[in-house]
Amino acid sequence: MVKNGVRFFYILAIGIVIIAAQNLVNIAKETVEYNLETHKGTITSPYSLQVYNSIEKYSNKYKIPKYIAYNIAFLETRYQGPFDWDYHGKLTSFAGAKGPMQIMPATANYIIGKNITKNELLHNIDLNIKISMKLLHKLHNQYDDWAVVCGYYNTGYPQVNSYARYCASNKNYKSRWVSY
């Protein structure tokens, strides 16, 4: 009789746990649905995950090897992947380059063919990375050597033909890129 009593309470406990788990799942679903409805479009993923998603999207679109895209993001703003919760790529360099891929406004305007504001370049992650990948694609079509392309990336596209071959920081950037 004792065994049957223990078995009964054991089965009862399992049933209660299952019902509680189902209730928690339902509450979680309702909460997510409520938040999505209430905050329509204002819920965002962590900044580092947004950068990751944009790099994945545009490196595929423009056929940029992922290791190139991620190395440049690391060299420009120390981006270390989608789980780098401390990452904050909304940076402006001393030269005026903006965002996670450090794009100069003049370069952005040249690559996209329309005026991009500094604010857009800094805060619109997707646009910043799209311009970056488009620039890398254009440079690779022109030079066909990723080490050279990555060095030229650092100077900005309009300046490539004028002084990139002689730029000391360009040589330093190329050597840092190759080491990563």
What is each of the regions a protein language model found here?
Residues 27-180:
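Catalytic glycan-binding domains that act on GlcNAc-containing polysaccharides
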